[in-house]
Amino acid sequence: LKRTHYCTQVTTADIGKEVVVGGFTAKQRDKGELVFIDLRDRTGIIQLIFDDSTDRAVMQKAKEVRSEYVLMAKGTVRRRESINPDIPTGEIEIFVTELRILAKAQTPPFHITDETDTNEELRLRYRYLDLRRKQLQDNLMKRARITKVTRDFFADNGFIEIDTPMMIKSTPEGARDYVVPSRIHKGSFYALPQSPQI
């Protein structure tokens, strides 16, 4: 399966069309003959639906899905029976005909939501999970846009960007250094700097 849309790119204009979306499972609700999955990607959330007309194997997969599983889903866009005005895709849902579980996940140590009361130490320990929160993703996207605008400005004004390695004295703490031998001072070594890991 190859993604055709990000979650919030699917709109009411796509009703009746077949789409492929992918992302993380924000929530799974099993109501017996009905299964709902809120699929989250970097743009937002869309609801996937499975009912008694869904292929048995696909329905079984949907029932196995847990929080933060990575999924790809193919299906037909249709209007939701109960509209959710709180999200951009609240008027639509995807009736899934094909579901792939790309990666399973253990139960996360905290809920990945914008409003979290999780202590900072736990969030930093699981930074890769914390970065899935919309607030932090928005910060990363803003930073990327600012960096691009800055680079474009300097490039348009004749500047050349040059990335050079910076040699520093090796430090005993932290991660393993990438050691570079000195050509001038035989037997001496430099280390490439370590980037902060937060």
Please report, for each region that a protein language model flagged, where it lies by residue.
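Class II aminoacyl-tRNA synthetase-like tRNA-binding/catalytic domains
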Residues: 2-198
